[in-house]
Structure formats: structure tokens, C-alpha cells
Amino acid sequence: MNILLITPGINKTFNDNYHSYKSIADDDNNILAISNQEIVAKGGDLRKDKEVEIDGSLVIHRIFKSIREQQSFVRRFLYKKKLNNLVSEFRPDVIFCEEISNLRLAMKIKRELGVPIILRTEFAFDADYPYRSMGRLLKIFKNPLTGDRLASAVGGLIWRWAYSCADSVISCYYEDALKQPEVYNTPFYYVPWPTFHPNIEGETKRKKDRAVFIGAFEPHKNLQELLVTIPEILEKTPLKEFCFVGAGHDLGVIQQLKISYPDSITHIRSLGREQCLKLIRDSFFAYSPATRGGWGFIGDSWAMKTPIIVTHNHYGFNDNIDSVVTAPQDIVNRVKSLYENDSEFERVRTGGFKRYVENHSANAVGARFLEICILACTKFSE
């Protein structure tokens, strides 16, 4: 199968989805990826990627210089000839479009070649949380007079348009699978965010007195909770060190903890991928207070066989099976239980790894993407 991938960013170091697409290509399929050269790393750092990259049957053409240029009708017109030549020569069977912002380009190609579109979004639109999807655009419509109502209405219109354009829709958000947003006869699928990890050298040297959190310090990560829970954990359990890796809006929370517990709080602004994985692997447990998102850190914890403690069940966590699901006021007892019960520690550790392999690994997600592509092509040709 020939799959045309239109994506706002693809890089084997910074994008776990890269490895899902690579697994599809390695399964006797061809993928032509159209993207841009801009890489937004954790912490907001901008980097430039090379224009052409060939990795077996996965071929990437970053013909646009930036995400903004890729989304601009005028700039896309300037690259029209180059884009048309690439796509015509490739002759795709299906268009795999990441995010609504790329849908107009996907629609143009669909009209010319007569192939189905699969739209993959991080979140489906939810009128109760209008800024979760298309937040940057919809916040333009927020005002004191109408509040969120206008933004919600506009978001609903855009979402209905997206459904009318797509032949299948994929969301990476677990709660979307529970709500099954209105689909207008368009198949809707939930496919988890993938996690990829390279082979990590060396044996696990787990520090029983250390825990870890890695990720962007953004409001939805709910770091304010840590001002209550971390002091309790440090003072009432065997934990002696909590290591944070990341930066962002709520950096002040970590700084406050550092002032109160200078010998116990470690903060690293940025760390390489392999170093992050080793840090997770060698820590006794991971802790995420996030109310949504944080999928990369969660998946990495499962992949590294490190138990993860969560205080909000936004990812279909199974308590005492693949994670420890608790409340802030009960977290001390649950941490103590991990320390005191080897069987519980082992059960959560192995259960998380099993979930990673079956549902969240690059190969598992890639296989699901390919299955949806085949279904879309079959239905489209009927």
C-alpha cells in the first residue's frame, strides 16, 4: 500500500509517531511524508531538519520551511508544482492527514486523485472543553460578552466540516473513545499515542529512594498538586529524592519545592532521550498528577517497567494492574505499599509493560493505523 502522510512534524528523535510509520513501511508498504523543516523540541526550542530523508520505504520531503508556511494557502501555492510532482509520481492509495490544519491540503489531493482521507487528531472536539482541540484558533473567539459559547460554536462547525471531509477519523485521546463524538456516518477510532524507546545499554540500577517526573510544566500537568503531595511523600515514606525534568509555565512550582527541600528536589531543564529513559528505568516509581496528556512520560514509564502513580484517571488506567491510581490525600499510603509489598511492585511493573507492548508500542500503533487504512480503502472503493 502507498500511504501519503501529511504531518506538521516528523523526526525520529522528537516524534514517537515516526516509529509507528516506520513500522508500517517495514511491513512491505510505502510512505511518502510531506512536512516542514521546523522541529519544536520540549521546552519550545526550535530546530531545523533536513529537507529530504530516506529511511527504507519511508521517504520524507520537508518541502515547507516552517509549520506556519505549511498551513498557509499562499505559501503552499508557491510549492504547488513540486508537491504535485511528488504526489503524482508516488500515486497514493490513501491520505493519512495529521491534524485539521493540514486537511485543506489533503482535500485538494483527494479531489485530484480520488483517494480516501484518514484524519488523525490528538483530540476530538468537545464542546465542554472547546480549547482542547484547535485551542490557538478558537481562543480568538473568546470574549467577555459571549464567554466560551462563540468559540464552542465555531469549533463545532469546524469539526463537522472536518468529518465531512474525512473518510475515517482517529483520536489519540482515551476519553474520546468513551464519548464517541458525533460522526455523521464517518468511522471513528481511538488509537493511543505511541511510545518508542531505543535499546538502552546497561542493567537496571534502580534507586529505591528516588522518583521522577518528566514533561512540559504546563497547566494541564497539574503541578500545583505537587506542593501538597511531595512534602508528604518526602517526610512520610522512604523516598529521599524527587527528580524533575522539563520546563514551562509552572516552573515556579518546582522552584518552590526546591527552596523547601534543597537536598531532595533535583531539577534538570533538558535531558536527551536515552538519558530520560535511563532515569525512568532506574527510579523506584514515576508520578504524574496530570489531568490530561503526559502520554509520552506515561508510556515511557510502562516501557521501562517502572511503576507509575497517577492521581487522575484520564488514560483508562487500571489500578493495581498497570498503574497505581490514587487520590492526593491517599498517595502516601499507596507509596508506602509499593515499598512494603514486593508482589504489588512487580505486578504493577509487569502489567504496565504488558500494556505498553500490546497497545502503545510503535509496532502496535503502526499495525492499528495500517488496519484503518485498509478498511478506509475497502469502503471507499465500494
Labelled PLM ranges:
Residues M1-K48, I233-K236, N363:
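N-terminal subdomain of nucleotide-sugar transferases
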Residues I214, E241-I254, R269:
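Glycosyltransferase donor-sugar binding loop
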Residues C97-N102, T121-E122:
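Short His-centered aromatic/hydrophobic patch
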Residues I170, T195, E203-K221, L227-I230, ...:
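Conserved donor-binding/catalytic core segment of Leloir-type glycosyltransferases
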Residues K81-N85, F125, I140-V169:
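Membrane-proximal helix-turn-helix segments that form the acceptor-binding/catalytic region
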Residues I254-E274:
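Nucleotide-activated donor-binding/catalytic signature segment of Leloir-type glycosyltransferases, i.e.
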Residues E340-I374:
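A charged, aromatic-enriched C-terminal amphipathic alpha-helix characteristic of glycosyltransferases
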Residues D167, R281-G293, T306:
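Acidic donor-binding loop of glycosyltransferase active sites
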